[in-house]
Amino acid sequence: MGQINILIGSNGSGKSNFLSFFEFLNKIYEQKMTEYVALNGGVDKFFHKGSKVTDVIQAEVFWKTNRYQIQLKEGDGRFVVAHEKLGYAAGSMIYYNDIANYTNEAGIKQYKGLKRGDYINNYLTEIKKYHFHDTGKTSPFTKESHIQNDRYYLYEKGDNLAAFLYAIHEETPIVYNRIVKVIQSIAPYFSDFYFHPTAANTLRLQWRDKYSSMVYGPTDFSDGTIRFIALATLFLQPTPPKVIIIDEPELGLHPVAIQKLAGMMHVAASKGTQIIVATQSTDLLCHFKPEEVITVNQVEGATQMVRLNSEDLNHWLEDYTLGDLWKQNIVKGGQPE
């Protein structure tokens, strides 16, 4: 995968499955695999076309010379970690060391052996798939968060957005002001967030309008605006995670907000964050190079992913945007609706 990876493809092509793999990998690392599988349909749903067709899941992820490999099999209605290994590439040779065999959960989190395990641990702990789609009256954005316990990193569903923004406000005001200005660029009426911790050090997301003295809550934003606020906080935070994974971040966003979103994604990537995003938006696609875009298609029941190449599209890109080429089926990747 590259630094920026924009996945395009039709519904059912496998984009969401691919993103969910990283979510699954994080649960494996956190030793929450059994719980995650049980809450998401059980073992059979995770096998390609069910356990009658597939009897093993194997994955290998690698960063430069370091590798992590895991193999899962079914045992008594649940997954068993059949093999778990660390790998190291030296030229054309790859050397593996066992971490665990036939255990209920992965062992990489507690691994204290080879130094490459520390490197892989640092990477796996920061793999998060973010979901900011729920914006209703009981959404994660409406929850109280603790200004001490919930300040360290943004949670996957934005539950601690208030406490995380408060921490940025207190510790890195320059970054905080940048986030506020970006929000104002798509919501001119927005003045600032209103931070008023309770005696118990909890906080709700509140804000003020430029034209009123009232204090508002998250449900007073439009769906698109509260999503944009979460996205701006995610991508512009002082130290973004090593990997940001998100499915259809453009949902509910105005074209101007989508343009801002693309810019924020590039900012995070420039700081070393790897971006993996699935989209159906031609507006978003227009802001990326062909080499940053991967087409996803289902071929004979399997997902096929192909990265675009500028040389193949230069003639077309003189007159059309990448989004136009996708609409016109010149870029093959499940045409946008």
Regions found by a protein language model. Name each.
Residues 57-63, 207:
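Short beta-strand segments that buttress and anchor functional surface loops
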Residues 1-54:
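Pre-Walker A-like glycine/lysine-rich segment at the N-terminus of P-loop NTPase domains
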Residues 8, 244-246:
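Walker B beta-strand of ABC/ABC-like P-loop ATPase nucleotide-binding domains
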Residues 174-177, 181-236, 246-259:
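Conserved ABC ATPase signature
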Residues 1-2, 236-239:
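Phosphate-binding P-loop
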